[in-house]
Each structure stands twice: as C-alpha cells, then as structure tokens.
From Swiss-Prot:
Keyword Isomerase: yes
Gene of this entry: gpmI
Protein name (database record): 2,3-bisphosphoglycerate-independent phosphoglycerate mutase
Catalysis: reaction(s): (2R)-2-phosphoglycerate = (2R)-3-phosphoglycerate
Organism (species): Campylobacter jejuni subsp. jejuni serotype O:2 (strain ATCC 700819 / NCTC 11168)
GO biological process, one term: glucose catabolic process
Length: 492
C-alpha cells in the first residue's frame, strides 16, 4: 500500500440531503461528480461527542483540525468548562481567586452567544456571577456574534445579558461586533476601535440594547456592530482586572496583545494592563495566568511522520493557516523536523463574498509544487466553503464551491501523475444550508455529516460510522507507518 499522501480539507462543505438553499448542490462541480462515481467515499461525523463537544453542538475548524491531526477525540474546552461550572470547580480556580483578591474592579470580555465555537453565553454569565458574589465591582463587555449564530440573534442575547447584569448589580459597559473586537488578520484599525471603547472613548449611548436595535434599523447586523459604551461607563483603569471568557484563542490574541504587550508598535496606546486572566492558553508568548491549561497531546500525525524522517508540507491561506499548523499539530506552534509551512495571504476584502475564490488558486499551486517536489505528506485547507458561507451570500458561496472544485481537479490530476494517494474531507459543514425554512439567513456551521473520499492502493471500501478522528491512522496506513496506540482506527 505504501504511497505518498495528500490530505485535502475542504472547510465548511457538508452533506445535506435537502437541496434547497444548498450552495454545494447548486454549484457546478465536475471534480466532485467524478469523485462520487470513481472513488471510495462515505460520510463522517463532525459534531457533538464525535469531536469532543457536547451532544448536538456543531463542530468548528479548531476542534475539527485538532481531531483530524491528533487521530483521537479530545474533550474540548467547552465540555471541560461546562463541567467546572456544574461542579463549582471554576469558582475555586486559584488563578481566578488571586485576580479577584488583587483587583477591586473586574472587566469580563467575550463573545456573547450560544454558538459554542469561541465562547458560550453560559460561561460569561457564570463568570459575572462568581465575580459579583465575591464582592468585586464588575463590568460586562459583550461582543456580538452574528456569524456562528444567526445575524440578528444578538438582540435576544443582549436583552438576556442586560437583565442578568441588572439582577446581579453588574455594569453593562460596552457593546461591539466581533468584526472589530475579534479580528485575527492584523487589521489593527478594527481592534483599535474596540480598545478605545474599553478605555471609555467610544460612542456613548444611554441604552446599549436600543443602540443594537437602531443598528439593525440601519442594516448593520451583529457581526458588524460599531463599538459603543454605556454613557455611565468611564473606562478601564490600569489597576483593574480583565478576564477573557473566550475559550478559543485565535480571535482573542490580537486584543490581548493590544491590552498587555509592552512591545506593541501598531498604534499608540494610552494605557496597558497587567492584570489579565484568559480562559485558555491564547499564545505561549503571553506569560499570563489561565483558567484552563491546555492538555498535552503527544504522538500526533505530524509528530509520527516527522519522527519517521519523512517530509511534510502544511499549507493554507491566512484565515485557516492556524488550523493546518497549530491546531492540526495538537496545539503546538513549533515547526517539526522536515515540516514545511506555506502561508498564502488571504485577500484584503471586507467580507469574502466580494472575492469568493479567496486565495484558493494560489493555495492549489502550493500543493502542486509540494507534490512535484516529492513531499511525503501534504495537508491543505481550502477556506472558501466556510468563509464565504459565513457571509450568507448564496450566489457568492456557489462560486466559492466552484473554485474549490476547480482546485480539486488540478490537485487530483497532479496526484495521479506522481502516484500520490489522497484523502478529501471537511472539518465541518456550512455552505450546504444557507437559509432555514422561513427564509432566514444561516451563516453558522451545521451539524451535518461531511464527505470523505479515499483514493489509495488497495482501498475499495470505507468502514461505516467513522469520524474525523479516524483520518490520521488512515494517512499513516497509506504511508506504511506504525499507528500509535493513542489514535483511533483507520477508515479502511
């Protein structure tokens, strides 16, 4: 069976038997049609307990790539935090107790929705309650979502938060869309707007809930809400404590850097803050206390390949680069021996419906070069189905799928020419359900299964009831390497 192998992750493309508002079904996709006819294929589970999330919880890119790259189900921070709240362990956390003892005033910052991708509203409320009951003066800073949940669901979430704050005696201080507060692509002008809001220098309003409704009236949805503050909020003081409740790291790193880093040079800052506490490890370079330390994941797919002396290439465009490197490698930043990484910049557009092909063709070229060079293993992510799917633009998402299909055709032709095996799958769904029955836009991930295709010598059938955690062992089997005991079985 021994063959070199390409693993292609088509982000956000899932299987939905309903063809209505299904951008995958609506797209012209000759490469996929060929795959369905000629290559062994099946469906994989990408949500809930199959990827270490609560039952019924949609999967996401971080969880999906970690599951694929580690070859096992890792119980995610969302599940760990839920358990810590249920059994009252969170309030006993030593780092939390230290911060609350040191700082009279405490600010809670995070994405406020039940999307479960970056955060959970229940975690936000639990933290507000712990801090308020401890006697601290508490300020809530809600970031509106509209991406992992529907675009105007924020009104109900923020109404809920406002009432919760009033009942607890907590200040509801600021409101801002994730487009600004949670940028991850070094668009510092966006983060600066939110930083200034936290300092009390933003647009002042008497009622943040009414401000949100007014934004809707002006066709601005949750993701894009401009930073605003309650008129009574006077801003953060340098001695205040700041707690970040997002458990996913990639969209909080820039904000933490702005608030805390002494070496930050992107724009002038009036204040920097020392008393920060993050829900999880956002970046090893931040020497900050955390509530939930990361679990050590050993014997990942990338590690096994590296230890065997084989070469590997990891490539994606900016939006998904962290997923094929940090998350795929089990939450480790360091480059492994014989590992090459190729980052393709994502296009500089406001939203990706403006350029649905994104940088897919450049990513495709990087893969073909890797095959021609003879890399033993290549992992690539095509971001289009997910990132354009998040915009809610159906026609643009059809074009996104068609761009991915074109790239698949080119890669598979190149793979065949150089005798490479390939596995194609997705980390989760998105573009296959763009509206609900009532015609409301769906911009979030789905809980649908995803396709998997395996073309390798000796493989004629894929086992039933498999998941993302079965892919790593499959790659090792193709490469003829020993499968570590920590990994789940192969797909075939």
């Amino acid at each position: 069976m021994k063959q070199k192998c390409v693993l292609i992750i088509t982000d956000g493309i899932g299987y939905n038997k309903n063809s209505k508002f299904n951008a995958f079904e609506a797209a012209k996709k000759p490469s996929y049609e060929k795959l369905f006819k000629e290559v062994p294929n099946s469906l994989l589970k990408t949500s809930g307990l199959a990827v270490g999330l609560p039952e019924g919880q949609m999967g996401n890119s971080e969880v999906g790539h970690m599951c694929i790259g580690s070859g096992r189900i890792i119980y995610q921070n969302l599940v760990r935090i839920n358990k810590a709240i249920e059994n009252k362990e969170l309030e006993k956390n030593e780092n939390l107790k230290k911060l609350l003892a040191k700082c009279k005033r405490v600010h809670i910052i995070g994405l406020y929705s039940d999307g479960g991708v970056h955060s959970m509203d229940t975690h936000f409320k639990a933290m507000l309650e712990i801090c308020a009951k401890n006697g601290n003066e508490v300020f809530a800073h809600a970031i509106t979502d509209g991406r992992d949940v529907s675009p105007k669901s924020g009104l109900n979430f923020i109404k809920d938060l406002k009432e919760f704050c009033e009942n607890l005696g907590v200040h509801f201080a600021t409101l801002c869309g994730r487009f600004y507060a949670m940028d991850r692509d070094k668009r510092w002008d966006r983060v600066k707007e939110y930083y200034e809001c936290l300092l009390g220098k933003a647009y002042k309003v008497p009622n943040l809930l009414e401000y949100l409704q007014k934004s809707y009236d002006e066709n601005v949805t949750d993701e894009f809400i401009k930073a605003a503050q309650n008129e009574n909020y006077k801003g953060m003081r340098e001695e205040d404590g700041i707690i970040f409740i997002n458990f996913r790291n990639d969209r909080m790193k820039q904000l933490v850097e702005v608030l805390n880093s002494k070496d930050f040079k992107e724009f002038e800052r009036e204040k920097i803050f020392e008393n920060l506490l993050t829900m999880s490890v956002y970046d090893d370079k931040f020497k900050l206390p955390v509530l939930f330390e990361k679990e050590k994941i050993e014997n990942t797919l990338a590690q096994v390949i590296s230890k065997a002396g084989l070469s590997q290439l990891h490539t994606a465009e900016t939006e998904k680069y962290a997923h094929v490197t940090f998350f795929f490698n089990g939450g480790k930043e360091e480059l492994l021996e014989n590992e090459t990484r190729v980052l393709i910049p994502s296009p500089k557009v406001k939203t990706y419906d403006e350029k649905p092909q994104m940088s897919a063709f450049e990513v495709c070229d990087a893969v073909k070069k890797g095959i021609e060079k003879g890399e033993d293993f290549i992992v690539v992510n095509f971001a289009n189905g997910d990132m354009v799917g998040h915009t809610g633009d159906f026609n643009a998402t059809i074009k996104a799928v068609e761009a991915v299909d074109t790239c698949l055709g080119e890669i598979l032709e190149c793979a065949k020419k150089h005798d490479y095996a390939f596995i194609i799958t997705s980390d989760h769904g998105n573009c296959e359900a763009m509206q609900d029955e009532k015609g409301n836009l769906l911009t979030n991930h789905t809980t649908f299964d995803v396709f998997v295709f395996v073309q390798a010598r000796g493989v004629s059938k894929i086992k039933d009831n498999m998941g993302l955690s079965n892919i790593a062992a499959s790659v090792l089997k193709i490469l003829d390497l020993e499968i570590p005991k920590e990994m789940n079985e192969a797909l075939f």
